Amino acid sequence: MEEKFRNLIEVWISALISLSYCYYISSKLSKGVLRLLSILPVCILFLVLPLFLSCVHFCAISVLFLSWLANFKLLLFAFDEGPLFPLPPKLSRFICFACLPIKIRQDPSPNAIPNLHPKPMPKWVLAVKILVLGVLLHVYEYRDGLPRFVVLALYCLHIYLEVELVLVFVGAVVSTLLGCNIEPVFNEPYLATSLQDFWSRRWNLMVSAVLRSTVHIPVQRFFKRILSPDGAMFAGVMASFFVSGLMHELLYFYMIRKPPTWEVTCFFVLHGAATATEIAVKRTQWLRPPHRAVSGLVVLTFVSVTGVWLFLAQVLRNNVHEKAIGECLLVLDLAKLFTSS
C-alpha cells in the first residue's frame, strides 16, 4: 500500500508542475494554435500518468480529474473558452478549476429553473448516504446468499454513493481552501423524471457542463450549416454521449488494462439515442406526460437495467468490483484502527 501512495504522490506532483507550466507559460501565448501546441504535451502526459496507478480508486479519480476534466478544460483554455478563462488571479485557483469537478456557486435569479441550480446537500442527507454506504460494505460479506439481482442492485447503488461522496468531499475541501461556495456535483439523480433530466440536470453535473462546452455546442454549431436546428441539436446530443462513452472506455482500460470491448460506449450511445428520442417526442406533444412517479420509475429501471447489462459488464467480468470493495473495506479497517488508538 505504501508503494501505491508513493505512486499517487508522484503522479500528482507531475500534474501540479504541468498545470503550473500552463498557468505561467501557456497563458502568456496568444490564444489559438500556438497556445494549443504548448498545451498538447501536458494533455498527452495526463493520458499517461494514470498508467502508473494500480489502485482502482486512485486510478479512477486520477483519470476523471486529469485525463478527462483537465484535458478538456485545457483544450478550451487554448481558445480562451471554458472555466479557465479569464485566467484566475492565483495559481491555486487555476489548478483547482482545471482538474477538479468544481464550479463557484452563483446566486440564481428568481425566475431560474430549480433543477438547473441545485441546492447544497443537507447535512442529514449526507449523513444518511454515508451510513447507507457503510451498511452496503458490510452487506457484501453476505452477498453469496443473496439473489443475483439484489447484488447487482447493490453494486449500482454503491457506484452512485461512492462517486457522489468522493466528489462532495473534494468540493468541501476546495470550498474551505478557496473560501467560496461550490456548486453541487449531483442533484439527487434518483428523483429524475426523464433521461434528459437525469443526464443534464442531476448526474455528475460538472462532467455534463464540460461535455456541453467541448462537444455539444461545437457539434451543434457545425451541423446547423447543413441540418435543421432540431437536427443539429440531436447531433450534439449524440456526439456528447458518444464522447462520454469513449472516455469511460478509457477509464476502464486504465483500471482493467485490457483492450476495450465497447460495451460501455454502447451504453452511452443507447442512452444518447433514447434521450434524443425522448426530446423529440416531447416536442411533438403527441403523448400526455405521465405522472412523475411513473416516469421516475421508468427512468430508474431503464438506467439500472442497461447499466448492469452494458455499463458494469467489463467491471464484473474482470472482478474490478471485488478489488474496489476490498479497498473500501481496507479504508474502514484503517479508520477503525485510527479511532481506537
UniProtKB/Swiss-Prot annotation:
<feature type="transmembrane region" description="Helical">
    <location>
        <begin position="58"/>
        <end position="78"/>
    </location>
</feature>
<dbReference type="InterPro" id="IPR044851">
    <property type="entry name" value="Wax_synthase"/>
</dbReference>
<dbReference type="GO" id="GO:0016020">
    <property type="term" value="C:membrane"/>
</dbReference>
<feature type="transmembrane region" description="Helical">
    <location>
        <begin position="149"/>
        <end position="169"/>
    </location>
</feature>
<protein>
    <recommendedName>
        <fullName>Probable long-chain-alcohol O-fatty-acyltransferase 1</fullName>
        <ecNumber>2.3.1.75</ecNumber>
    </recommendedName>
</protein>
<keyword id="KW-0808">Transferase</keyword>
<dbReference type="InterPro" id="IPR017088">
    <property type="entry name" value="Wax_synthase_Magnoliopsida"/>
</dbReference>
<feature type="transmembrane region" description="Helical">
    <location>
        <begin position="261"/>
        <end position="281"/>
    </location>
</feature>
<feature type="transmembrane region" description="Helical">
    <location>
        <begin position="293"/>
        <end position="313"/>
    </location>
</feature>
<keyword id="KW-0012">Acyltransferase</keyword>
<dbReference type="Pfam" id="PF13813">
    <property type="entry name" value="MBOAT_2"/>
</dbReference>
<dbReference type="InterPro" id="IPR032805">
    <property type="entry name" value="Wax_synthase_dom"/>
</dbReference>
<feature type="transmembrane region" description="Helical">
    <location>
        <begin position="36"/>
        <end position="56"/>
    </location>
</feature>
<keyword id="KW-0812">Transmembrane</keyword>
<keyword id="KW-0444">Lipid biosynthesis</keyword>
<feature type="transmembrane region" description="Helical">
    <location>
        <begin position="7"/>
        <end position="27"/>
    </location>
</feature>
<dbReference type="GO" id="GO:0047196">
    <property type="term" value="F:long-chain-alcohol O-fatty-acyltransferase activity"/>
</dbReference>
<comment type="function">
    <text>Catalyzes the final step in the synthesis of long-chain linear esters (waxes).</text>
</comment>
<keyword id="KW-1133">Transmembrane helix</keyword>
<keyword id="KW-0443">Lipid metabolism</keyword>
<feature type="transmembrane region" description="Helical">
    <location>
        <begin position="233"/>
        <end position="253"/>
    </location>
</feature>
<feature type="transmembrane region" description="Helical">
    <location>
        <begin position="120"/>
        <end position="140"/>
    </location>
</feature>
<comment type="similarity">
    <text>Belongs to the wax synthase family.</text>
</comment>
<dbReference type="GO" id="GO:0006629">
    <property type="term" value="P:lipid metabolic process"/>
</dbReference>
<keyword id="KW-0472">Membrane</keyword>
